[in-house]
C-alpha cells in the first residue's frame, strides 16, 4: 500500500468512525432515543413490553403509526451504510420491509412476496432491484432485513442470508442526502394528499450503521433457534434424540442405534444444504399415480452428530404386493441430487450458492453430516397395472449396520395415462452440443446420442424436435444425418432416412407432434447475412415445402406434422406474411406454427398462422380467444423470461414454480407448450457452471455426462409431473365435462387472474408485455407456492374423479 493510499484509507476510516452507529433496542425510559442517546425518532408507535427479539419492541397499528428518522451532516451515512431491523408482521399486514425515504434516497419496502430496494448516489445514479421470496414470508414470525450500501452497489439480506443485489458500474461515492427524514413503518407512500403503506406488527433492533456489514452470523443463529423452538425443541441434541425416539417407535428399539434417521419429503419442497429439517421421521413412503405414470418423492437420510456417512446403499423393490399377496412389477429408481453452482441467479431470485439440479445414478451414496443431502426416489407404474393399493419396502443400509426396511405404498388409480402425448408440445434438443462428443465421421454415434436425449424427453411427456438445427452442426454431420433440403436440377433432394426412422420410432413411443422442414433461423438464409426473405426465396422454398407435405403424407404422419420455419420474428409483419403466404401456396395441409418473442401474439395483422405460440407474458388474451374460437390452437412457451414469481424453468425456480408452468398453462387456457432448449450449452469440456451461466440454466434441464449421455434433473422430473397433471385434466374434461368444469373453477380460484379491462387494446408491441397488463399476475401463484399441498389435493380430486 502506497503512502497516498494509506492516507486515503485513513481518511475514509476516520469518517466512518466519526459518524455515529445509530441503534435502537426500544428498551428503557425513552424507547425512541438511540442507545447512545444522540438521535431521537419522532412519530407514533406503542411500546410492546417484553415482546421483542430481546426486551421490548415497538408495535405499529397498521393505520396511522409511523416514525421518522431525521438525518443531518453529523449522523447521515455517506460512503457505506448498513440499515437493518427485525420485524414481526401481524396477520393481514401487507407492507414489509418498512423503510422509505420520501425523496427515495433509500427505499426498502414491499410485501410478503416481493420487496423493492433502491438507493441514489450523490451524483444521481439510481441503484435498484427487486427480490421475490420462494414462498411468502409468514405473519407471526420474526424476520431480519438488512440493506447494505458500499462502493460496489447495494445488497440486501433476509434472515442473515443474501437475497438481492444491484451493482454499480463504478464506485458509488456518497449516498444521496436530500435532507428529508426517512419514514419507518408507515406513510411510506403519499399521493393526492392521502397516505398509505402502513405496517402492522412489531419492530425491534433498528440500526443505521456507517459501515457495510455483509455477514450476519448472529441472525442466522437466532433464526435456527427459532425454527427449533417452533418445532418444540430447545437444541440440536433434543432434535436428534426425538429422531431416535421416532425411529424406535416406527421400526423397533434397534433402529434407534442406527447412525441415521430417515424421512420422506415431497418433491415440491426444495431442500437446501444448510436447511434445518424438523419434519416427520420414519413414515412410509407413499405415492399415488395412474398406470403409465411416473411419480417422485425425496428420501432424506439424516446422520447423527454431524458425522459423515459414506457408502450407504438403497435397494429398491422390483415388485410390490397387491391386497391378495400377488407380486406386481413396479419400476423404482433412486438417484443422488447434485447441488450445482449457480454463478448468477435469475432476476429477483436469491443468489443461492448451490441449487439442487442433476440426478446422479449410483449404487452407493456418501452422506455429509453437516448438510442435507436428499436422494430422489421415482416410481413408474407400468401400463396395464390394475387399480389398487400395493405395498412393499425399500432397504437402506449403512456400512456395519443392519438394513432398515422402509415401507413403501403405491396407490394406483384404475385408469391409465395414454401412451400418446395428448398435450401437444415441442422441445428443442440442442444438437450443436451433441456433435462435440463424437469423432468426425461418426454419424452413428451422433444419432445414438440424439436418440438418448429424444427418448428422455418422450419418457417425460415432451415431444422432441428432431434434426432441426442443420445450420448449427458441422458439414459432415449435416450431410450424413440431416434431411438437408435443397433443389438440384429442378428437383428436391433430401436425406430423409434418419429423420424418418427416428420419427417412426418416437411415434410408437407417444410422439404427437412432428416439427418438419427447414428452420430458417438456423441456416444460411439468416446466418449468412443479407436480406432474410431474399435468401429464403433463393432456396426455392415452394418446391421444398411441397415435397415435405407429400413426404409426410406418404409416411403417414401428416396429421401430426407442423411447419416451424421461423422463430420469434416479433413485429416483422411483412416478412411473416411472406413466409406464411409461401407456405400456404406450397403446402396448404401443413399447419404453420409461429413463436412470438417480444410481441403480443396472436395479432390480426399476421395471416396464415395455424398454431400461435406467444410467450407466457407476451400474449394478447382477447385475440387468443378469437383464434381458439376459430379452431386455431394457441400454445405458450417461456424463454429466459418471464421471471419469478411467474412460472419458469430457471435452475433456481422453486419446484412448484416449475410444475406450475404446465398447470398454469392449462389454467389460463393454452392448448400446448413449446420450449427452446432442453440441453443448451452442454458441449464437451464446457466449464462446470456453463449451462447455469446463461439465464440461470433456463434452457438446460438435461445435462451431459463426460461421454455426452443425458443426465436428468429435478426440473425435468418436476416439469414432467406438471405435464401429467395437464394430461389428467384433459382426460377428465373429455370423459366427464361436468367434473372437469368443477375442477377448472377450483383451479381458477387457486390461481386467480389479474383484474383488467378486457376492452383495453393490446397492440402488437405496446404495451410491451401484454400478459402483465392483462391476465397474468405472478403473485397470484404464491398461494400454491406457499402450500404446494393445495395443488396436490386438487390433483388428487382429478385422479379420484377419473378413478370413479
Annotate the PLM regions.
Residues 238-281, 298, 304-377:
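Surface-exposed binding patches on compact interaction domains or structured appendages
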Residues 225-285, 294, 305, 401-442:
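Long, low-complexity ectodomains and other extracytoplasmic segments of secretory-pathway proteins
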Residues 504, 509, 517-533, 537, ...:
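Catalytic domains of carbohydrate-active enzymes that cleave complex glycans
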Residues 610-691:
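Catalytic-core region of carbohydrate-active enzymes that cleave or remodel glycosidic bonds
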Residues 19-231:
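Extracellular glycan-associated modules
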Residues 74-76, 380-387:
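Short, surface-exposed loop/turn segments at beta-strand-coil junctions that are enriched for proline
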Amino acid at each position: 500500500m502506497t503512502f497516498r493510499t494509506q492516507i486515503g484509507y485513513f481518511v475514509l476510516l476516520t469518517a466512518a468512525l466519526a459518524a455515529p452507529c445509530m441503534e435502537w433496542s426500544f428498551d428503557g425510559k425513552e424507547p425512541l432515543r438511540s442507545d447512545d442517546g444522540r438521535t431521537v425518532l419522532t412519530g407514533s408507535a406503542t411500546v410492546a413490553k417484553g415482546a421483542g427479539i430481546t426486551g421490548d419492541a415497538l408495535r405499529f397499528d397498521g393505520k396511522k403509526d409511523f416514525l421518522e428518522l431525521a438525518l443531518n451532516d453529523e449522523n447521515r451515512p455517506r460512503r457505506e451504510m448498513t440499515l437493518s431491523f427485525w420485524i414481526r408482521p401481524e396477520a393481514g399486514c401487507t407492507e414489509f420491509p418498512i423503510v422509505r425515504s420520501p425523496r427515495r434516497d433509500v427505499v426498502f419496502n414491499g410485501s410478503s412476496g416481493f420487496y423493492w430496494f433502491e438507493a441514489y448516489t450523490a451524483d444521481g445514479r439510481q441503484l435498484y432491484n427487486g427480490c421475490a421470496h420462494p414462498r411468502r414470508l409468514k405473519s407471526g414470525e420474526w424476520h431480519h432485513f438488512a440493506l447494505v450500501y458500499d462502493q460496489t452497489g447495494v445488497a440486501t439480506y433476509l434472515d442473515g442470508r443474501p437475497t438481492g443485489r444491484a451493482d454499480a458500474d463504478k464506485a458509488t461515492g456518497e449516498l444521496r442526502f436530500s435532507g428529508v427524514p426517512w419514514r419507518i413503518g408507515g406513510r411510506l407512500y403519499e399521493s393526492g394528499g392521502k397516505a398509505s403503506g402502513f405496517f402492522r406488527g412489531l419492530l425491534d433492533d433498528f440500526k443505521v450503521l456507517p459501515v457495510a456489514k455483509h455477514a450476519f452470523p448472529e441472525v442466522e443463529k437466532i433464526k435456527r433457534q427459532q425454527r427449533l423452538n417452533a418445532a418444540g425443541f430447545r437444541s440440536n441434541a433434543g432434535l436428534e434424540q426425538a429422531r431416535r425416539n421416532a425411529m424406535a417407535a416406527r421400526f423397533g428399539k434397534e433402529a434407534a442405534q442406527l447412525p441415521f434417521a430417515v424421512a420422506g419429503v415431497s418433491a415440491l419442497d426444495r431442500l437446501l444444504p444448510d436447511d434445518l429439517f424438523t419434519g416427520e421421521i420414519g413414515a412410509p413412503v407413499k405415492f399415488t399415480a395412474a398406470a403409465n405414470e411416473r411419480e417422485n418423492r425425496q428420501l432424506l437420510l439424516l446422520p447423527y452428530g454431524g458425522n459423515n456417512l459414506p457408502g450407504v446403499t438403497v435397494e429398491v423393490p422390483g415388485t410390490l404386493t397387491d391386497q391378495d399377496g400377488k407380486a406386481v412389477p413396479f419400476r423404482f429408481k433412486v438417484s443422488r441430487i447434485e447441488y450445482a453452482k449457480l454463478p448468477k441467479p435469475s432476476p429477483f431470485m436469491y443468489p443461492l450458492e448451490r441449487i439442487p439440479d442433476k440426478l446422479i445414478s449410483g449404487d452407493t451414496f456418501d452422506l455429509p453430516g453437516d448438510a442435507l443431502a436428499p436422494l430422489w426416489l421415482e416410481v413408474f407404474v407400468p401400463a396395464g397395472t390394475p387399480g389398487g393399493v400395493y405395498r412393499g419396502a425399500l432397504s437402506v443400509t449403512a456400512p456395519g449396520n443392519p438394513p432398515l426396511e422402509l415401507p413403501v405404498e403405491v396407490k394406483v388409480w384404475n385408469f391409465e395415462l395414454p401412451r400418446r402425448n395428448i398435450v401437444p408440445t415441442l422441445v428443442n434438443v440442442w444438437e450443436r452440443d451433441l456433435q462435440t462428443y463424437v469423432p468426425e465421421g461418426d454419424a452413428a454415434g451422433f444419432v445414438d446420442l440424439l436418440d438418448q436425449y429424444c427418448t428422455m424427453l418422450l419418457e417425460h411427456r415432451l415431444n422432441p424436435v428432431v434434426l432441426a438445427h442443420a445450420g448449427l452442426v458441422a458439414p459432415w454431420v449435416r450431410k450424413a444425418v440431416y434431411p438437408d433440403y435443397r433443389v438440384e436440377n429442378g428437383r428436391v433432394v433430401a436425406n430423409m432416412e434418419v429423420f424418418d426412422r427416428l420419427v417412426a420410432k418416437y411415434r410408437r413411443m407417444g410422439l404427437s407432434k412432428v416439427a418438419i422442414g427447414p428452420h430458417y433461423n438456423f441456416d444460411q438464409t439468416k446466418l449468412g447475412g443479407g436480406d432474410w426473405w431474399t435468401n429464403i426465396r433463393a432456396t426455392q422454398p415452394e418446391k421444398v415445402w411441397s415435397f415435405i407435405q407429400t413426404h409426410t403424407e406418404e409416411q403417414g404422419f401428416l396429421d401430426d406434422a407442423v411447419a416451424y420455419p421461423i422463430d420469434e420474428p416479433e413485429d416483422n409483419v411483412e416478412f411473416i406474411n411472406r413466409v406464411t403466404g409461401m407456405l400456404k401456396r406450397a403446402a396448404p395441409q401443413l399447419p404453420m406454427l409461429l413463436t412470438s418473442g417480444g410481441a403480443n401474439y396472436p395479432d390480426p395483422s399476421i395471416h396464415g398462422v395455424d398454431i400461435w405460440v406467444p410467450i407466457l407474458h407476451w400474449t394478447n388474451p382477447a385475440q387468443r380467444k378469437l383464434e381458439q374460437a376459430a379452431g386455431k390452437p394457441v400454445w405458450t412457451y417461456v424463454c429466459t423470461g418471464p421471471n419469478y414469481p411467474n412460472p419458469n424453468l430457471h435452475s433456481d425456480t422453486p419446484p412448484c414454480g416449475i410444475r406450475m408452468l404446465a398447470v398454469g398453462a392449462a389454467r389460463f387456457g393454452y392448448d400446448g407448450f413449446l420450449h427452446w432448449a432442453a440441453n443448451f450449452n452442454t458441449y464437451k469440456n464446457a466449464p462446470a457452471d456453463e449451462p447455469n451461466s446463461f439465464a440461470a440454466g433456463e434452457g438446460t434441464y438435461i445435462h451431459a455426462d463426460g461421454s455426452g449421455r443425458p443426465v436428468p434433473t429435478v426440473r425435468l422430473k418436476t416439469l414432467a409431473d406438471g405435464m401429467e397433471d395437464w394430461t389428467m385434466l384433459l382426460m377428465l374434461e373429455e370423459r366427464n365435462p361436468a367434473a372437469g368444469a368443477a375442477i377448472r373453477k377450483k383451479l381458477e380460484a387457486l390461481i386467480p387472474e389479474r383484474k383488467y379491462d378486457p376492452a383495453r387494446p393490446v397492440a402488437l408491441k405496446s404495451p410491451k408485455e401484454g400478459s402483465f397488463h392483462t391476465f397474468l399476475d405472478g403473485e397470484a401463484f404464491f398461494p400454491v407456492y406457499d402450500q404446494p399441498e393445495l395443488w396436490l389435493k386438487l390433483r388428487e380430486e382429478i385422479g379420484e374423479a377419473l378413478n370413479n
